[in-house]
Amino acid sequence: MDTTTAKQASTKFVVLGLLLGILMSAMDNTIVATAMGNIVADLGSFDKFAWVTASYMVAVMAGMPIYGKLSDMYGRKRFFLFGLIFFLIGSALCGIAQTMNQLIIFRAIQGIGGGALLPIAFTIIFDLFPPEKRGKMSGMFGAVFGLSSVLGPLLGAIITDSISWHWVFYINVPIGALSLFFIIRYYKESLEHRKQKIDWGGAITLVVSIVCLMFALELGGKTYDWNSIQIIGLFIVFAVFFIAFFIVERKAEEPIISFWMFKNRLFATAQILAFLYGGTFIILAVFIPIFVQAVYGSSATSAGFILTPMMIGSVIGSMIGGIFQTKASFRNLMLISVIAFFIGMLLLSNMTPDTARVWLTVFMMISGFGVGFNFSLLPAASMNDLEPRFRGTANSTNSFLRSFGMTLGVTIFGTVQTNVFTNKLNDAFSGMKGSAGSGAAQNIGDPQEIFQAGTRSQIPDAILNRIIDAMSSSITYVFLLALIPIVLAAVTILFMGKARVKTTAEMTKKAN
């Protein structure tokens, strides 16, 4: 095998290793959410279940900006491997957890590793490939990310139903081990890096502010009331340390986040879009399965399968966005994305309990197609105009804002859906005569419990139909509200300019 062929083979294995890492990290939170009912039933401590997600997301989000900067300073490989090893250790420990407290701690360990995988993987692709090949690769990586995000609920339901909840964590071990082998064996990177000063002040203030904000968002309205001293205190500490972070970063020699990047129009708009898209597309993965299970009366596994059309649309959109990066501007490609996303969400917002499932499939495919573009285009746009030594910071910022948008979107839209559902129930039963109606709304606990097959069959049709209408209306109302951030995204896209990915030949010609 000659040198060129050997290098190409090595690169393919590196790409495979990175794809496996993205598959695990992107799928993890949604696959675990599906299994939470079984986990609580086995380990108990229902009052602590919110901490299982919170501890993981806090660790992931706190680590993302730090890993991005460190990978710029000291190399991608070592920090990707560090994240991978921590993620695998955390996954194995989660699988053997005997108490809810243990699971919470082990999820935090898993999150410490998970924060490195996604941003560094995308950055390595930019380091490995010339501009004309990056689009295809970023399209592939974006497709895997989008696929993983919606594959999680389906896979989680299947594993939980057929094996046990422990395997939603154990499944990461063989996947991660393969990724570890491919990266160690085939990814070659210089081990020499110039000595640089780490911005400890920025790192500490940023981590503390993110930890407080994420805990407030994850636990508010669940473990603690929004107006409780705990949540208000977390928001206050977040504000103090976030202001301190800005002050420290202005004076730092090597800031964790270089704010001068936001003076670049393409970079700035890509970050805004990552936040808006993240906060909007996640509600599809969350509420569509609930709609199918609650309104149509499907099983949890069947509800997971309903996300398949969105997966297909997302993969197609991501690949198209990646392939055409050198042929069309980021703005024009993202306009196609946002138009499809808007149409799909608008159609979803008009669903009723009588909407045929075939139409739901079509609406989801349209939405998924629109969403898919952002997975490949926005990381590329973030790094497009920057030198290699800033790519890690740029992409980790993009990944952070997308994840933050997802967390905020679930929190805000989840609260809205719950409130609308409760109000609709009260309105529906206020007109019913007799005790069957007067206490029905108050006796309803977790809406998803009601729509389990065993429970559903015991509810009188007159009451069940009203509950279904309330659930349907509350979810479609959320889809209607989601049009607001999509419109804001459309306006933001108009400011992206005419930039596109330039090929190597074009850059050489310009340099000469």
From Swiss-Prot:
Membrane disposition: Multi-pass membrane protein
Q: Where in the cell is it found?
A: Cell membrane
State any single GO MF term.
Answer: transmembrane transporter activity
Task: Provide a GO CC annotation, any one.
Answer: plasma membrane
Q: Which residues cross the membrane?
A: 13-33, 48-68, 79-99, 109-129, 139-159, 163-183, 200-220, 228-248, 272-292, 304-324, 333-353, 358-378, 399-421, 475-495
Supply the CDD domains for this chain: MFS_Azr1_MDR_like
Q: Which signals induce this protein? A: Expression is dependent on the growth phase and decreases in the late log phase.
Query: What InterPro entries does the database record attribute to this sequence?
Result: EmrB-like, MFS, MFS_dom, MFS_trans_sf
- Note the superkingdom of the native organism: Bacteria
State the UniProt keywords alphabetically: Antibiotic resistance, Cell membrane, Membrane, Transmembrane, Transmembrane helix, Transport
Which terms under GO biological process does the entry name?
Answer: response to antibiotic; transmembrane transport
- Does Membrane count among this protein's keywords? yes
PANTHER family according to UniProt: MAJOR FACILITATOR SUPERFAMILY (PTHR23501), MULTIDRUG RESISTANCE PROTEIN 3 (PTHR23501:SF170)
Give the protein's function: Confers resistance to puromycin, tosufloxacin and norfloxacin.
Q: Which family does it belong to?
A: Belongs to the major facilitator superfamily. EmrB family.
Q: NCBIfam families, from UniProt?
A: efflux_EmrB
Please identify the protein, giving its name as recorded.
Answer: Multidrug resistance protein 3
- Species, as recorded: Bacillus subtilis (strain 168)
The major lineage groups are: Bacteria, Bacillati, Bacillota, Bacilli, Bacillales
